Amino acid sequence: MEITEVRVFPVNEEKLKAYVTITLDHCFVIRDLKVIHGNTGLFIAMPAKRRKDGTFKDIAHPLNSDTREKMERTILAEYDRELKKGAAAPARATGTDPHED
């Protein structure tokens, strides 16, 4: 499995830093991953749905730690590139909807 596209949609919140959409093997899209700033730094949160009891259940997630680490490295690298690109641009469009294609 290859991550063939990563789209980062930065947000300016205290903990939530970006929404992310990834494409796997040019044929499968996963939306609503999140870049979160936690106590130990940045990490990726998988898309989740709130259950009736108030807990969250992942909608999609890696089945092993190697895949999770590969996804996290790839997504965080693209997040860093997006931040640098945004810092270099004098005027940046805001309000981009991560659900549009």
Swiss-Prot record:
Protein's GO biological process: division septum assembly; sporulation resulting in formation of a cellular spore
Pfam families with a match to the protein in the record: SpoVG
The organism's place on the tree of life at top rank: Bacteria
Keyword set, alphabetical order: Cell cycle, Cell division, Septation
Family as reported in the entry's similarity comment: Belongs to the SpoVG family.
Purpose of the protein: Could be involved in septation.
Protein name in the entry: Putative septation protein SpoVG
Gene giving rise to this polypeptide: spoVG
